Amino acid sequence: MSEQLSEAVRQLIAKARIVSFAAWQSTYPSEIVARFQAADDEGRYLTDEDLQAIATHQPEVAESTAIAQMLRDRVAEIVEEARAGVLAHFPDITEPGGGLYPPLRAEACWRDFWHFLRCITYGIAGQQTVYTSDEGLYHMKLLYQELQVPLDAMVVGLEGIKTASLKRCRSEQGETLAPYFDHLITQLDAFRG
């Protein structure tokens, strides 16, 4: 797929880094921020080792790191539920003429869902409800415009990620965790304006 992308799109992809840890320096020592940054640089979820180091250094986030770990471990089923929700809400979206056709477009959408949850888990693990980069989001908006990504479907998918994730948590955790999801939903929803 990358061979089919224009140079402009490739540049936007490189700049569409939606997480920022700049404000975290006041809460976490540089070695902990570096763990978050390395995970994001590598496009991966925090490892067990990362989560343990974070919880050891900041014991008050131990429950949050455990939740981030659980969501990471269940990402495939969470993304699958969100995908099913998008397909139920937009039944023709993967058909010819639909916003996620051809299949490579749909695969990119589901991959974005995986990355959205990855970014959300960083916020949860670090107990930072505002974890996005305005600059990265701006470039993501330009990228989505350039690729004509169906924003309605992406917002429905992100809401599905929230629903699927929260149902895997204890009910009393929902109120605490919802803002991490709502933050990114609000940011993505603003792309439509």
Sequence positions of predicted segments:
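Core of compact, soluble alpha-helical bundle domains
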Residues: 1-149, 154-155, 166-193
